[in-house]
């Protein structure tokens, strides 16, 4: 619309100035100049001067309009960029004129309102989820405390310290998992918050083997552990690595039908092998366990290799 007005205004201005000057000359100055034609009189150059002055004034007005239009476009551009960034939601823009730019500003304001609503809704959902996780953590820890007390009294009456030690370790592990509820989301591993720390592989795997040794012996599986000659330290997260290896121990116990499992630390890498029947990666139960292993390794920046066939399954874990 602005471009059309600018194009049509120049000839219209020339026509208006020429007609006005001609009328003024004919009515006031032509009798004084003895009927001299307009184009030969002094009024003609005066008309040119008036036209040029009017043209400059018109150009100034259009430049102001274009500057105002560019200012609105830049304001819209900055607002949309702020809306797309991780910063706070921008304030709505004031609509000053009911033109095309005004309609566009109304649309952007509607988008800002929608984004603000969604942000508040997500924040409220996040608070509700945190509250539910805290309640769940409390509800889990309450029976765990009672279970510890009951085991304490049973320990004096029964023999078999290995059984009680394994149960205590499992209870402590569940308790540590509940303490992590405030560090990561319950929905995806990608949204988890990981604190890297020094993890001593010899100690971690020795603890894991002791924890699972009783259950493996009850299932007729020999569990052998060969630590490294020297301490091997990875920058990772102890609890998440426990979850990683516990998942492997659990899957082997449930599905492998193995007679022997070996856990070895060699050249800074972790090797876990069994002599079971292997598994099909596309099968739902094993596939879910493998997905957990893949996601956890990606989360901890651990490289792993998997080999499985009818003669058993082998895992290789390494970290740069």
Curated annotation (Swiss-Prot):
It is found in: Cell membrane. Pfam families: HAMP, HisKA. Residues 135-320 form the Histidine kinase domain. The keyword Mitochondrion does not apply. GO terms for cellular component: plasma membrane. The modification Phosphohistidine is found at residue 138. Signal peptide: none annotated. It is a multi-pass membrane protein. The keyword Disulfide bond does not apply. Residues 22-41 are extracellular. It comes from the Bacteria. It catalyses: ATP + protein L-histidine = ADP + protein N-phospho-L-histidine. Residues 67-120 form the HAMP domain. Coiled coil: none annotated. It is an enzyme of class 2 (transferase). Its EC number is 2.7.13.3. Residues 63-320 are cytoplasmic. Keywords: ATP-binding, Cell membrane, Kinase, Membrane, Nucleotide-binding, Phosphoprotein, Transferase, Transmembrane, Transmembrane helix, Two-component regulatory system. The chain crosses the membrane at residues 1-21, 42-62. Member of the two-component regulatory system YbdK/YbdJ. Probably activates YbdJ by phosphorylation. This is Sensor histidine kinase YbdK. It comes from Bacillus subtilis (strain 168).
């Amino acid at each position: 619309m602005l471009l059309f007005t600018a194009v049509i205004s120049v000839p219209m201005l020339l026509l208006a100035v020429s007609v006005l000057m001609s009328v003024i000359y004919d009515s006031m100055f032509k009798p004084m100049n003895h009927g001299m034609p307009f184009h030969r009189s002094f009024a003609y150059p005066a008309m040119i001067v008036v036209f040029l002055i009017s043209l400059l004034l018109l150009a100034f007005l259009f430049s102001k309009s274009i500057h105002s239009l560019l200012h609105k476009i830049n304001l819209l551009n900055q607002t949309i960029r702020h809306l797309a960034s991780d910063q706070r939601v921008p304030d709505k823009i004031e609509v000053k004129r009911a033109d095309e730019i005004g309609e566009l500003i109304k649309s952007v304001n509607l988008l800002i309102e929608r984004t603000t609503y969604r942000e508040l809704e997500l924040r409220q959902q996040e608070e509700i989820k945190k509250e539910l996780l805290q309640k769940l953590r409390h509800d889990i820890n309450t029976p765990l405390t009672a279970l510890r007390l009951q085991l304490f009294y049973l320990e004096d009456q029964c023999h078999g310290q290995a059984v009680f030690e394994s149960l205590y370790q499992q209870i402590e592990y569940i308790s540590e998992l509940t303490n992590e509820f405030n560090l990561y989301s319950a929905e995806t591993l990608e949204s988890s918050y990981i604190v890297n720390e020094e993890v001593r592989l010899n100690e971690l795997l020795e603890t894991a083997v002791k924890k699972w040794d009783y259950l493996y012996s009850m299932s007729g599986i020999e569990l052998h552990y060969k630590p490294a000659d020297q301490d091997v330290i990875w920058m990772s997260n102890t609890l998440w690595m426990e979850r990683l290896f516990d998942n492997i121990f659990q899957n082997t116990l449930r599905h492998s039908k193995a007679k022997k499992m070996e856990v070895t630390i060699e050249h800074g890498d972790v090797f876990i092998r069994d002599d079971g029947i292997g598994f099909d990666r596309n099968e739902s139960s094993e596939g879910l366990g493998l997905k957990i292993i893949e996601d956890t390794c990606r989360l901890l920046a651990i490289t792993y290799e998997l080999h499985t066939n009818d003669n058993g399954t082998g895992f290789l874990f390494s970290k740069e």
